[in-house]
Amino acid sequence: MNSQNSQIQPQARYILPSFIEHSSFGVKESNPYNKLFEERIIFLGVQVDDASANDIMAQLLVLESLDPDRDITMYINSPGGGFTSLMAIYDTMQYVRADIQTVCLGQAASAAAVLLAAGTPGKRMALPNARVLIHQPSLSGVIQGQFSDLEIQAAEIERMRTLMETTLARHTGKDAGVIRKDTDRDKILTAEEAKDYGIIDTVLEYRKLSAQTA
């Protein structure tokens, strides 16, 4: 496996299976994440941090360069993470020309919930048992220093919170004041509740059920 491929794959807790594909170009060994990337699918299955943000931004930019008119799909199962990493991914999602479908499976919590809501309107989805959690941003670790330093940190937390609220308000249609009140504490939403809230547009049916009723 070359280094370029390894950079776009989240860390797995077990060895991913590889498989062989035959085509007119010959035989190629692949793995699930490479195959998803070929299908223009990005999988966010880890915490949102600088490493995962860099990987996702790189994939978004490459997929746009390959075909700016084809949709990119981002599957999300993430506990959230850092605010600056979130905004780096968010800005890149808004920057690229391709529409971005977002799909939550498992959970989209904290920063990941903002990314879920930031998909192209009408193309934001969740599976039936997914959950979404929104809350105000915070700084990790113990904050120490002079009073003036603490004031700077407090101002930064307030700036981050206001930016998150206005971002969610933009994508959900909710008033920023409502967002602030709802995110004072953890607000946990089912898939249907996330739809009513404006974070997603559609709760997906299982493909098996859709095929049976067709």
Swiss-Prot record:
Localization in the cell: Cytoplasm
Pfam families in UniProt: CLP_protease
UniProt keyword terms in alphabetical order: Cytoplasm, Hydrolase, Protease, Serine protease
One GO process term, biological-process aspect: protein quality control for misfolded or incompletely synthesized proteins
Active-site residues, record numbering mapped to chain: 110, 135
SUPFAM superfamilies per UniProt: ClpP/crotonase (SSF52096)
EC numbers: 3.4.21.92
Superkingdom of source: Bacteria
Catalytic activity of the protein: Hydrolysis of proteins to small peptides in the presence of ATP and magnesium. alpha-casein is the usual test substrate. In the absence of ATP, only oligopeptides shorter than five residues are hydrolyzed (such as succinyl-Leu-Tyr-|-NHMec, and Leu-Tyr-Leu-|-Tyr-Trp, in which cleavage of the -Tyr-|-Leu- and -Tyr-|-Trp bonds also occurs)
Cellular component, GO annotation: cytosol; endopeptidase Clp complex; peptidoglycan-based cell wall; plasma membrane
Molecular function GO labels: ATP-dependent peptidase activity; ATPase binding; serine-type endopeptidase activity
Signal peptide: none
Function as written in the Swiss-Prot or TrEMBL entry: Cleaves peptides in various proteins in a process that requires ATP hydrolysis. Has a chymotrypsin-like activity. Plays a major role in the degradation of misfolded proteins. Degrades anti-sigma-D factor RsdA when present in a complex with ClpP1 and ClpX. Degrades anti-sigma-E factor RseA in the presence of ClpC1. Does not seem to act on anti-sigma-L factor RslA.
HAMAP family recorded: ClpP
Family the entry assigns: Belongs to the peptidase S14 family.
Record note on quaternary structure: Fourteen ClpP subunits assemble into 2 heptameric rings which stack back to back to give a disk-like structure with a central cavity, resembling the structure of eukaryotic proteasomes. Forms a complex with ClpP1 and ClpX.
The protein's name: ATP-dependent Clp protease proteolytic subunit 2
Protein's gene: clpP2
